A protein has these predicted regions:
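Positively charged n-region of N-terminal signal peptides that target proteins for export
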Residues: 1-5
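Generic preference for well-ordered secondary structure
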Residues: 6, 21, 28, 42, ...
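Bacterial N-terminal signal peptides
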Residues: 6-15
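N-terminal signal peptide c-region/cleavage motif recognized by signal peptidases
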Residues: 17-19
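Immediate post-signal-peptide N-terminus of mature secreted/exported proteins
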Residues: 21-79, 186-191
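C-terminal amphipathic alpha-helix
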Residues: 26, 30-33, 44-48, 115-192
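A structural signal for well-ordered alpha-helices, especially hydrophobic packing surfaces
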Residues: 41, 45-48, 99, 106, ...
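Mid-chain, structured segments of secreted extracytoplasmic proteins
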Residues: 62-108
């Protein structure tokens, strides 16, 4: 019994020691956090460039559901013209592919948010460690990194929303054309 108690106390002491060392106010921890922050910022810049490219494509894309009324789209399907139907089916497929890709990007940027939250929490813990060691300058610097990572979290969330909103525009395009097809041809089509 006494041996078990000694082992339990030793385990608790090791756990406490590990936790303290995990967030020490030292050069190694700072370098780790700075590397992680630089990586997160670079990935954000890459996602932003990708979004801007996609936005340019989106702005130049012709959305049939915006160019033509629902009745006009129905009339294209009713004409039973193979050329029109091929073009409409191609538009549906293109819109669905764009929807899936943009939704994937929204999901990937959401995953990045989780990683940046961990980074912010690391800076917060390091700041507290610096404060407890009376290293006021390091504490203030770490706090500025906490604020910066919080801004990065907001930027990622905004970017994720933008990807998601573009994805929904493409989904609406696909669904509008499919709805017109269903109305014209009476098919029981999947609108998802």
């Amino acid at each position: 019994m006494r041996y078990a108690l000694v082992c339990l106390i030793a385990l608790a002491a090791a756990t406490i020691t590990f936790r303290v060392h995990a967030f020490e106010c030292n050069q190694y921890k700072w370098d780790q956090l700075l590397d992680s922050q630089l990586t997160a910022e670079n990935r954000y810049n890459d996602y932003s460039k990708e979004f801007n490219l996609v936005l340019g494509i989106f702005k130049s894309h012709i959305f049939l559901s915006k160019q033509f009324s629902h009745q006009e789209l129905i009339s294209f399907w009713k004409q039973n013209n193979p050329y029109f139907q091929r073009q409409l089916n191609l538009q549906i497929e293109t819109a669905r592919q764009a929807y899936k890709l943009l939704l994937k990007q929204a999901h990937l940027t959401q995953i990045e948010i989780e990683q940046v939250i961990e980074l912010r929490d690391g800076w917060t813990s390091t700041a507290e460690s610096c404060r407890s060691q009376s290293q006021e300058y390091q504490y203030m610097t770490a706090q500025s990194h906490v604020a910066h990572t919080q801004t990065l979290i907001s930027d990622y969330a905004s970017l994720s929303d933008k990807f998601r909103n573009l994805a929904l525009r493409y989904l609406n395009e696909s669904n509008s054309i499919l709805s017109a097809k269903q109305a014209a041809l009476g098919d029981d089509l999947d609108l998802k």
